[in-house]
A protein has these predicted regions:
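Conserved donor-binding/catalytic core segment of Leloir-type glycosyltransferases
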Residues: 3-7, 175-193, 199
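A short, glycine/small-residue-rich beta-strand->loop->alpha-helix junction that serves as a flexible
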Residues: 6-21, 191-193
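A charged, aromatic-enriched C-terminal amphipathic alpha-helix characteristic of glycosyltransferases
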Residues: 17, 319-353
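Nucleotide-activated donor-binding/catalytic signature segment of Leloir-type glycosyltransferases, i.e.
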Residues: 51-61, 223-243, 297
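Acidic donor-binding loop of glycosyltransferase active sites
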Residues: 76, 127, 251-265, 278
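Membrane-proximal helix-turn-helix segments that form the acceptor-binding/catalytic region
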Residues: 112-129, 253
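A short, active-site helix/loop in glycosyltransferases that binds the activated sugar's phosphate group
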Residues: 124-150, 158-163, 224
Length: 358
């Protein structure tokens, strides 16, 4: 079977995350001599380039060439994360949603409608839509009730992340924060100023060069956050980036990551951070739109980001107490190890070994 894996998407998915999932799929399928993998795309990370160089069963191919090849073959299937390949309608399509239009803030009504329409089209067209964990399964089945029979959880753990030696991590910090240690924060725009106030308290306490790096969902939010930053006393210690520009090295090099009001689209980032021994902090305030599922509550530390002094105290704690920070990271690692062991022993679909061409 020729398995075409598309590396583009209509939806907002960090490039590093999407390409890591492509790597995970192929690594889990290399044991089969019946599958030849075609990675469709360009400007791919070194991890996928190396995978092709070291495996005869892997070929990187540009989209135009893939469109030509798909017309010439008879035994093929397509895996995608929200994309199309011209000329492939006669073959089985498998949709792996890593995000959903409702997870993207700030969309215009027309843009959100267009993305939702595309999402439903992929659901309808797919032979099966595979989710990567029970959080995504619950969310998508509740939202797209018409397609619940197509939506099912698959076994697709992180297989192998890039290994960064301390020199590479130091380079990442130099590029991002001029060498300063930093916290990484996924914070909604409407809570941005509140976190700045808490970070100010921490900076006044500690007199440190620690930096707070915010990751927003799109360039529009980045621009709005930058306008709110005008006049902030510790402006030089704040960095603002879009998730589309985020690199895996940023995760691997951070002190800790703060997640506020997250959707299932951040679950892969959670797993990656844990693999890199990074402790996680979750907002468990009762006013959140979606609470952290019970099965994921041991992945990190939970407290209310809205409680006065809560964030500033945790900034201080993770900055000053390395033993505590490492202990929290180990707790996350233990949780993820147990989760993967449990999933491996259940009757989940194994991607790509269980896929068929029609």
């Amino acid at each position: 079977m020729r398995l075409f894996i598309l590396t583009s998407s209509k939806f907002t998915i960090p490039r590093a995350l999407l390409c890591q999932k492509v790597l995970d799929i192929i690594e889990l399928g290399l044991s089969s001599a019946q599958i030849h993998f075609y990675i469709v795309g360009d400007n791919l990370p070194d991890s996928l380039l190396t995978l092709e160089q070291t495996n005869d069963a892997v070929t990187i191919i540009k989209e135009v060439a893939a469109e030509k090849l798909i017309k010439e073959v008879t035994n093929a299937a397509i895996i995608h994360f929200g994309a199309d390949l011209k000329g492939s309608d006669q073959f089985a399509h498998y949709f792996i949603p890593l995000s959903d239009p409702s997870c993207i803030p700030g969309l215009s009504m027309i843009h959100k409608w267009s993305l939702t329409k595309a999402f439903k089209k992929y659901l309808k067209k797919s032979v099966a839509t595979y989710t990567i964990n029970e959080w995504a399964t619950r969310f998508l089945k509740n939202k797209y009730k018409r397609y619940t029979t197509k939506i099912q959880e698959a076994y697709l753990p992180i297989h192998r992340l890039p290994i960064y030696e301390w020199v590479a991590l130091a380079d990442a910090k130099n590029s991002l924060t001029d060498g300063a240690n930093y916290f990484l924060a996924f914070q909604p725009l409407d809570a941005f100023v509140d976190m700045l106030k808490e970070f100010s308290i921490f900076k006044k306490w500690q007199q440190t060069n620690m930096v707070l790096v915010f990751i927003f969902e799109n360039e529009k939010e980045v621009a709005q956050a930058e306008s709110l930053l005008v006049g902030y006393k510790f402006k030089d210690a704040i960095l603002i980036n879009s998730i589309s520009n985020m690199e895996l090295k940023w995760i691997a090099a951070t002190y800790a990551i703060l997640f506020n009001n997250i959707c299932f689209d951040k679950t892969s980032l959670i797993e990656m951070a844990i693999e890199y021994d990074i402790p996680l902090l979750f907002n468990n305030d009762e006013n959140q739109n979606e609470s952290l599922p019970t099965a994921w509550q041991q992945a990190g530390e939970q407290f209310s980001f809205e409680e006065k002094g809560g964030l500033s105290n945790h900034f201080k704690l993770y900055y000053k107490d390395e033993v505590y920070r490492q202990g929290r990271a180990r707790m996350g690692k233990d949780w993820l190890t147990d989760l993967y062991a449990e999933k491996k022993n259940t009757a989940l679909v194994k991607i790509p070994l269980a896929l068929k061409t029609n």
